Amino acid sequence: MMTDPIADMLTRIRNAVRVERPFVDIPASRVKRGLADVLKREGFIWDWKEEKLEEEPVGYLRLELKYGPNGERVIQSIRRISKPGRRLYSRSKELKPVLGGLGIRIISTSKGVISDREARRDKIGGEVLCEVS
């Protein structure tokens, strides 16, 4: 059993991007669906879909990774911020833009999983899950 499924998801994405895979498969959960949805809305992946195999109890998410016209990575870095041993929460006023607006932080809020831009716009704070640039 893994202790941090979100870190596992981010590591799978990071590894797939490094070897330029067109997609990556990740075990599904509600938070991971939210993360994938934010990555799609913010333009870091093309799309995602959930698939379920009959012999497996848990479905999985297939993320279609995005690359530039010359094969350059859209996701340059992706890292976990709030960890199981050290949770990090931020108010909306404390959420500063990542790389001058070129990157995002993904926040888990009472309204679901959203980007830092949406959190600032809606004036909602929450747990800072990760940072993508």
Swiss-Prot record:
Gene3D superfamilies: 3.30.1370.30, 3.30.1490.10. GO terms for biological process: translation. Keywords: Ribonucleoprotein, Ribosomal protein, RNA-binding, rRNA-binding. GO terms for molecular function: rRNA binding; structural constituent of ribosome. GO terms for cellular component: cytosolic small ribosomal subunit. It comes from the Bacteria. InterPro entries: Ribosomal_uS8, Ribosomal_uS8_CS, Ribosomal_uS8_sf. NCBIfam families: PRK00136.1. One of the primary rRNA binding proteins, it binds directly to 16S rRNA central domain where it helps coordinate assembly of the platform of the 30S subunit. Part of the 30S ribosomal subunit. Contacts proteins S5 and S12. Belongs to the universal ribosomal protein uS8 family. This is Small ribosomal subunit protein uS8. The gene is rpsH.
